[in-house]
Swiss-Prot record:
Gene: cbiJ
Taxonomic placement: Bacteria, Bacillati, Cyanobacteriota, Cyanophyceae, Synechococcales
First-level EC class: oxidoreductase
Name of the protein in its database record: Cobalt-precorrin-6A reductase
Pathway participation: Cofactor biosynthesis; adenosylcobalamin biosynthesis; cob(II)yrinate a,c-diamide from sirohydrochlorin (anaerobic route): step 7/10
Record InterPro entries: Precorrin-6x_reduct
An MF annotation (GO) of this entry: precorrin-6A reductase activity
GO biological process terms on file: cobalamin biosynthetic process
Pfam families: CbiJ (PF02571)
Enzyme nomenclature, EC number: 1.3.1.106
Keywords: Cobalamin biosynthesis, NAD, Oxidoreductase
Function comment: Catalyzes the reduction of the macrocycle of cobalt-precorrin-6A to cobalt-precorrin-6B.
Matches recorded under PROSITE patterns: COBK_CBIJ (PS51014)
Domain of life: Bacteria
Family, as annotated: Belongs to the precorrin-6x reductase family.
Length: 261
């Protein structure tokens, strides 16, 4: 029997993290989920074993957080591109000898019209930049990354799809996007809407992250193939070697094995 005070810290904010949380609470395991926005809180079911903390944690706050909440196991189900939090937590878990496991679905196979680039710099400043020059390009990389494309505003017709938040809009405008080249949509975006948007803007290329099917990448692959549009996928950042799985049952077993009884 698991110690009733022992808690699993689930780094969440993703659809995958909801599945992880549901698996843990089904076993009666106390689960504390952290998310960075109040909207993400609604991903999770209401349950006596589940608590959701809203707000980002700094590296300095995490050790106190672990102690205050009696964290015995850490499950990282953050976004594949949330490399900073993964790197930070991995180091702290090792230092404090807290069992750590990461849940991450494998990347999708490359589609027929998909080109993968190693990082955003190779696309905006490196050898893949010609794929953007002179083209009508839709950027679906998140508002925080739009500044990387600022210097290309005079070399391509760039459009940005962002989340419907004031901060995201401010970041897009600061990166040089005018109101007629910005659309705010909350995912998931259905295939017909995705296709209609690309056609409306006469898109010739789309830049996305390798976020997997849950991140809408599969829909983009289908639309790219249907319309003959080039899809440029930014590869996931390299993860620190360690415990990682895409099997929910392994997450459950890991927690059961490492939680004190």
């Amino acid at each position: 029997m698991v110690d009733s005070l022992a808690t699993v810290w689930l780094i969440g904010g993703t659809v995958d993290s909801r599945a992880v949380a549901e698996g843990l609470i089904a076993q009666g395991i106390n689960c504390l989920v952290t998310v960075t926005t109040s909207e993400a809180k609604h991903l999770y079911p209401i349950h006596q074993c589940l608590t959701v903390h809203v707000g980002a944690l700094t590296p300095q706050e995490i050790p106190k957080f672990l102690k205050r909440h009696s964290i015995a196991v850490i499950v990282d189900a953050s976004h594949p591109f949330a490399a900073q939090i993964t790197t930070t937590v991995t180091a702290i878990a090792k230092e404090q000898q807290i069992p750590y496991i990461r849940f991450e679905r494998p990347p999708l196979a490359l589609g027929k019209n998909t080109l993968e680039v190693p990082d955003i710099q190779s696309l905006t400043r490196g050898k893949y930049q010609p794929y953007l020059r002179g083209k009508r390009v839709l950027l679906t990389v998140g508002a925080r990354w739009l500044s990387h494309f600022s210097l290309l505003q005079d070399e391509a017709v760039l459009f940005a799809r962002i989340l419907p938040y004031p901060q995201a809009l401010a970041q897009a405008i600061a990166a040089g996007f005018t109101s007629d080249r910005i659309i705010a949509l909350r995912p998931p975006v259905a295939e017909p809407l995705e296709k209609a948007l690309w056609q409306q803007w006469q898109i010739q290329g789309v830049v996305t992250k390798a976020s997997g099917a849950q991140g809408g990448e599969l829909v983009k692959q289908k639309v790219a193939e249907a319309l003959g549009v080039n899809l440029i996928r930014i590869a996931r950042p390299q993860t620190i070697p360690g415990q990682i799985t895409d099997d929910l049952s392994q997450i459950n077993q890991f927690c059961q094995r490492h939680l004190p009884s």
